[in-house]
Amino acid sequence: MPPRKICFVITSFIHYARNLLILEELNRRDDIELHVVIGGTALLSKYTPRYGQVRTMLEEDGIEHIHELYFALEGDNRVVKAKTAGLGIVEFATMFNDLKPDLVVVRGDRFEVLSAATAAAYMNISLAHIEGGDITGTLDESVRHAITKLAHLHIATNEAARERLLRMGEDPRSVFNF
């Protein structure tokens, strides 16, 4: 049986650090072919203190399949974020069509993550969402909940978030707290 192809999306520098243990575990398994897509603000020097180093660090960690996806527009206002999210859907759809992953994994609540989740949903690709159910009181919270509704597998980071996911109607068999 061929290995399952997992596409892990990283759209900010901090998500590299937060996902490192997961990436290492996925990468060491023979039954998984791991692809990491770096995009969004993870590729912009203005937002990433270690600009350009995410790819280098992934390579040093032994990740073989690394893809860069440029779709973030310059600026920091609502119009730019909305346009970036739209462009991101287009770019992620192309990437997913080329890679044909069995599963896409996203983390968080940013507009770039929503782009990946939306593309995966429309392409009928299974989606895992890490950090669903968290609350922030910001616009990002609505985006997080939208991503939750697009996801098939939910990985909460605390029990309160797991309970919120269940109250949102998610299948208890697909909701986990790690």
PLM regions and their residue ranges:
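Short Gly/Thr/Asp-enriched flexible loops that form oxyanion-binding sites at enzyme active sites
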Residues: G108-I125
